[in-house]
Curated annotation (Swiss-Prot):
Keywords: Cytoplasm, Hydrolase, Metal-binding, Nucleotide-binding. Its cofactor is a divalent metal cation. It holds the Pfam family SurE. It comes from the Bacteria. NCBIfam families: PRK00346.1-3, PRK00346.1-4, surE. Belongs to the SurE nucleotidase family. Signal peptide: none annotated. It comes from Pseudomonas putida (strain W619). Binds 1 divalent metal cation per subunit. A divalent metal cation binds at D8, D9, S39, N91. This is 5'-nucleotidase SurE. GO terms for cellular component: cytoplasm. The keyword Electron transport does not apply.
Amino acid sequence: MRILISNDDGVTAPGLAALHGALVDYAECVVIAPDQDKSGAGSSLTLDRPLHPQTLANGFISLNGTPTDCVHLGLNGLLPETPDMVVSGINLGANLGDDVIYSGTVAAALEGRFLGGTSLAFSLLSRLPDNLPSAAFIARRLVEAQSRLELPPRTVLNVNIPNLPLEHIRGIQVTRLGHRARAAAPTKVVNPRGKEGYWIAVAGDAEDGGPGTDFHAVMQGYVSITPLQLDRTFNDAFEQLHGWLEGVL
C-alpha cells in the first residue's frame, strides 16, 4: 500500500506531521505539500509559473504550489510509483458544509479521484494542535478500515473531528453537508501610503446545521464522515429548465 499525503496548511504544519506519523508504519507514505499555507486554495492549479519540488531533511517534498498541484504531480510522474490512495490533512480548522468548496484540504483528496478509489480528507475543529493525537488515531483507524469498504469509484470521504480528547469522542456518524449563512462583509484596511485593501471575513455560521448534518454531528461530540462526489449537477432543476427553454431558440 502506497499513500500520498498532502494538506493545505503547508509542509511544516503539525497536522501533516501527525497524519504522517499515524500512517508511516501502516503503509509506504510519501508527503507532497505546499511550501506555505494554502488554506482556501480550493481546487486551483498553478498555470503561470513552473513548480519546483524540493525534498526536505525529513523526506517530505515541498512544492511552490497548491494542494491540488501537489497531488496532481504526485499522480502524474513526480513519484517513481503511482500511489494507491490519497489522504489529506490533518487540517487545523473545520471543513464543514460550504467549506468544502474552498478547502484545499478537501481539494487535495478530490484530486485523488483519478486513482479510482476512495480518498480521505481529515480536519480537526481547532486552530490549536492540542488534540491532534486523537485526530491522528482516528485517521489511522479509518484508513485501515477503508480497505474493507466498497464505495462507488472516485468517492471522497470528508472527515471532521471534534476538538476533544479521544475518550470524550462519542463515536462516528455518516452525515450530509450542512450549509453556512453568508459570510460577514470584508474588512477594509488602508496601508500607510493610503492604498485601500480588504481582508476576507470568516465563514458564516451554520444556517442548515440540524440533525443529519456534519455541523450537528461534531457539535454533539461525534466524528462526522460525509461522502462527496465530483458531480455537482443539480438534477432536480432539469424539469424546470426544459420547460423554461421551450421557445427560447
